[in-house]
C-alpha cells in the first residue's frame, strides 16, 4: 500500500512540475511561448547545425493609440488577434514567441532568404487587415552558418524592424 501511495505521489508531483513549466513558459494573454521560453531555448538553438535559420521580429503598430483611445481591453484584443494571425500563418519548423507587450519573435529553420522575405511581406499585408489600422513593423535576419550568433541575428532583425517602423510613420 505504501508503494502505491509513493507512485501516485510521484506522478502527481510530475504533473505539478509540468503545469508549472507550462505557466512559466506561456504568455497568459496570447497562449504563445514567452521570453522565459526564449531564454531557455537560446542555447539549444545555438547548437542547431541545420541551416539556413532565420529570426523574424514583429512589432505591432498603434498599440498605444488603441489603448489610449479605446481602452486596454481593446488593445489586448488586438494583440490576441495579431497572435492568432501569426499562428494561422505559421510556417513549419518555426516557433512564435511573444517577447514583450507588442513584440514577437519567430524562429525558423530551413527557409531561404527569399522565402522569409515573402513570408514577412505576407505577414505585413495580413496585419494591415486588423482593426484600427493596426499593422506591424517586421524585420528579419538570416543565419547561414555557425559564424553568426542568434544574438547577432536578433539584433539585425530588430534593426530591420525599426527601419520598417520608421517607414510606417
Give short role names for the model-derived ranges.
Residues 88-93, 119-133:
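Short catalytic/binding micro-motifs of nucleotide second-messenger systems
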Residues 13-27:
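Membrane-proximal helical linkers
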